[in-house]
Design a protein with these regions (language model features):
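Soluble or luminal CAZymes and related metallo-dependent hydrolases
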Residues: 69, 96, 148, 172, ...
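ADP-ribose/adenylate-binding Rossmann-like module
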Residues: 133-145
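Glycine-rich phosphate-binding loop at the start of an alpha helix
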Residues: 123, 146, 174
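N-terminal glycine-/serine-/threonine-rich beta1-alpha1-beta2 phosphate-ribose binding loop
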Residues: 1-134, 151-164
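Predominantly a Rossmann-like dinucleotide-binding segment in NAD(P)-dependent oxidoreductases
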Residues: 39, 158-166, 171-242
Length: 242
């Protein structure tokens, strides 16, 4: 499927459905879906690299609050593009600061975006992406509180099949897990009377404050601040519940 065909076909797809890898494959250089990434930390860089390896995209734009995140990710993403014969990301398509996401979304060359920021920003950034007419893959969770989730529901209701948008609950769409759930529901292992779940982790490290402001310190270490992360139960619950 060529890029233009994919973009036109979005009208036939319901809001917040998963985009299957085969949907994005193309056979010509100009058929690649042009993607931008909002939030260039380790998670975002890893996810968009994986998308590139499994689908026909070219990464053309980056946005982040911090320059060091941009520069570190740039090395990886230029390599990802190079491996597929695509050009490096232009300096003019690198956006830094609190309005960086809006600048990227205003880039007419961008077809779709990956939103991989701290969770508190997901509703706002997703809303802006949809308003800009961009297809979006937004990392989980949808939001950190009930009001944020209601906001996301409203965003989804307003898409009306015009865009492809999905949250990163990839386990829900993975064939092995779908088959497992189907077999359980069909009684393949009998009646389930008890389920026990265990999760062991060393936790997320917290960085030094150095000379940064408290706001910057809090955002860089957002997992340690419930007000902008939702807390451990939310962050881990979205991973271990299927």
């Amino acid at each position: 499927m060529e890029r233009r065909t994919f973009l036109k076909s979005a009208a036939a797809v319901s809001a917040f459905t998963i985009l299957k890898p085969v949907t994005a494959f193309g056979t010509k250089a100009n058929s690649a879906i042009r993607m931008g990434i909002i939030g260039c930390g380790g998670r975002g860089t890893g996810v968009i690299s994986s998308i590139s390896k499994n689908t026909n995209i070219v990464i053309i734009a980056m946005a982040d609050l911090f320059d060091d995140k941009l520069q570190k990710a740039l090395v990886t993403l230029n390599k990802v593009n190079s491996e597929k014969g695509y050009p490096e990301i232009q300096n003019t398509n690198m956006y830094k600061g609190s309005k960086a996401y809006l600048q990227l979304l205003n880039n007419k060359e961008v077809d779709a975006v990956l939103i991989s920021t701290p969770a508190y920003a997901h509703p706002e950034f997703l809303e802006a992406a949809v308003a800009a007419g961009k297809h979006a893959y937004c990392e989980k969770p949808a939001a950190i509180d009930v009001e944020g989730c209601k906001r996301v529901q409203k965003i989804a209701a307003g898409i009306h099949g015009k865009l492809n948008a999905v949250h990163g609950f990839q386990i829900r769409y993975a064939s092995p897990f779908i088959e497992m759930i189907n077999r359980i529901q069909q009684g393949a292992i009998g009646d389930i009377v008890n389920v026990q779940l265990y999760y062991l982790s060393s936790g997320v490290g917290i960085g030094p404050i150095n000379n940064m402001s408290f706001d910057e310190y809090r955002i860089r270490n957002h997992f340690h601040f419930h007000a902008i992360s939702g807390g451990t139960l939310l962050d881990q619950g979205i991973h271990i519940r299927i």
